[in-house]
Amino acid sequence: MNDLLPDLCDHYEQDVRWLPLVLNDYGGKKIFYGEVVTLRCFEDNSLVRDIVSQDGTGKVLFIDGHASYNGALLGDQLALLAVKNGWQGIVINGTARDVGTLATLDLGVKALGTCPYKTVKRQTGDMNVTMTVAHTMIYPGDYLYADLNGILLSKQSLDLSVL
């Protein structure tokens, strides 16, 4: 299957929310889904390391970086750590770096763009909070479905076997 979202929209139209945000695909995994873990941070990715160091089996990290282009919230080292710990994907309302390497990893990565600079490390940010991105509410525990068509969110896990 190359396109998941159109089929989900056709079958679960009343159960999904579209995230109207144009993101670039940088990871090696083009279709990914899982339970959402949220992080709100601004130009500081130290909490990203804390989160991807934990078991991420069946989970997707959604980072609201306030659309800043001043420092990458994800690079190759954190992405490798995420893969090692079973994360399905990382979505960034902000930037990533080392995208040549990210493209080789078994991890979904979507971001606004790239920035070659690293962020500062102040241990600031808010984990597992409700966020608003592109006029869309994103809740910890939501389920996120992503492919090259974009991102859908749902309050519950969707049965993909019906597609």
Curated annotation (Swiss-Prot):
Subunit-structure text: Homotrimer.
Cofactor(s) named in the record: a divalent metal cation
Binding site for substrate: G75, D76, Q77, L78, R97
Keywords: Lyase, Metal-binding
Cofactor note: Divalent metal cation.
Species this chain originates from: Photobacterium profundum (strain SS9)
Gene Ontology biological process: regulation of RNA metabolic process
Signal sequence residues: none
GO molecular function annotation: 4-hydroxy-4-methyl-2-oxoglutarate aldolase activity; metal ion binding; oxaloacetate decarboxylase activity; ribonuclease inhibitor activity
UniProt function note: Catalyzes the aldol cleavage of 4-hydroxy-4-methyl-2-oxoglutarate (HMG) into 2 molecules of pyruvate. Also contains a secondary oxaloacetate (OAA) decarboxylase activity due to the common pyruvate enolate transition state formed following C-C bond cleavage in the retro-aldol and decarboxylation reactions.
Record-listed a divalent metal cation binding positions: D98
Record's protein name: Putative 4-hydroxy-4-methyl-2-oxoglutarate aldolase
UniProt cross-references to InterPro entries, sorted A to Z: RraA, RraA/RraA-like, RraA/RraA-like_sf
